[in-house]
């Protein structure tokens, strides 16, 4: 599944999908996003934001963490049913369906912190994979530096799509990706996501994850 190239067109393709794996220590981006929220829970789970912050900071006894979001279902009784939609981290760039053990441990961890009238249900979140094709336009003088510029652009795109920088229900907006890419890579004259024209929206329990990344190069 590559791309045809000619003398003035170059493409690189990267499949970012993997099957399984662990994870490193909590990233700086993840800490910035969730640590202040978790601190504000004061070790009690009352609001949906409390549940979300707790689940996103939770680590199983085998060191696995994930991404989560929370919604509430109003029951006919006085109890609220809190749905925790979770995905387990397979690596620093990939999420997967959470294992039963991970979900069991997460549910058990909420028991002593939730309100007595709340019922917590741990549910599978959904991953929506996305292939991205980006064409970058460079000045002719950078032809000899093409490989380095492609690699630098790739790092910028992967960082933008990193799971620590995305969340449930967040759309993919190609214009936002290009804006960040051009801010990061000042030697790129012009860039375009050529296979996605409009923002891609997802449901509240879905998260967009990069699958294949291809970078093509034009010269002027």
What are these regions (language model features)?
Residues 42-173:
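Carbohydrate-recognition loop of C-type lectin domains
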Residues 123, 148-220:
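An aromatic-glycine-centered, glycine-rich loop/turn in mixed alpha/beta architecture
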Residues 3, 8, 85, 133, ...:
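Intrinsic disorder/low-complexity detector
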Residues 19-20, 61-64, 201, 219:
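Intrinsically disordered, low-complexity segments enriched in small/polar residues
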Residues 23-30, 34, 127-144, 180-200:
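A broadly tuned preference for mixed-charge, low-complexity surface segments
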Residues 1-53:
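Catalytic P-loop NTP-binding/switch module of NTPases
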Residues 1-2, 8, 117-119, 169, ...:
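Glycine-centered loop/turn motifs
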